[in-house]
From Swiss-Prot:
GO terms for molecular function: rRNA binding; structural constituent of ribosome; tRNA binding. One of its GO terms (biological process) is translation. This is Large ribosomal subunit protein uL5. Pfam families: Ribosomal_L5 (PF00281), Ribosomal_L5_C (PF00673). Keywords: Ribonucleoprotein, Ribosomal protein, RNA-binding, rRNA-binding, tRNA-binding. The gene is rplE. It comes from Chlorobium phaeobacteroides (strain BS1). It comes from the Bacteria. This is one of the proteins that bind and probably mediate the attachment of the 5S RNA into the large ribosomal subunit, where it forms part of the central protuberance. In the 70S ribosome it contacts protein S13 of the 30S subunit (bridge B1b), connecting the 2 subunits; this bridge is implicated in subunit movement. Contacts the P site tRNA; the 5S rRNA and some of its associated proteins might help stabilize positioning of ribosome-bound tRNAs.
Amino acid sequence: MAEKKEKVKPTEQQKARLENTYKDKVVPALMERFKYKNIMMVPRLTKISVNIGVGEAAAEPKLLETAIQELSQITGQKPQIRKARKAISNFKLREGQAIGCRVTMRKKYMYEFLERFVTLAVPRIRDFRGLSTTSFDGRGNYSVGVREQIIFPEIDIDKVPRIQGMDISFVTTAKTDEEAFALLSELGMPFRKKNN
């Protein structure tokens, strides 16, 4: 008989710092602000998706390999190759052709990435004045475009063949943009100040 393995819960030290911050500070702050009756009503981050689109991969397949390598360095996970859903002749694109890569992070990896993004990567963005507050989708999710992959400290600038951007989507359980904005702000996202 095969023995059943027990799931080992991570200790408090093994959990990401932002995960503890969420439980200790963010949840009480949001419960007070939005007057939630139950702790399960408090919005939470469910996943972060990082996508790199490489349209030129048709002409130069090496660009896609570089994007995959860089995305795995940034996120610590193996990227999933994204393929074209339909052919577009103007872009010389065939159906099923590899045109990008994506990583979806959840739980511990998600909080670790968010912490690195907020504390290390965002301050390295040139002429940074805060993240846009208009990039919410109306259902509590937030997307941000990054123009350069070199803002992440994991990327060695000398080994980068070309500057490449990426899309980062933060998916939450929030029902409104206001709740999602409050959640991400409490987690440390540096949003642009609204001018009155």
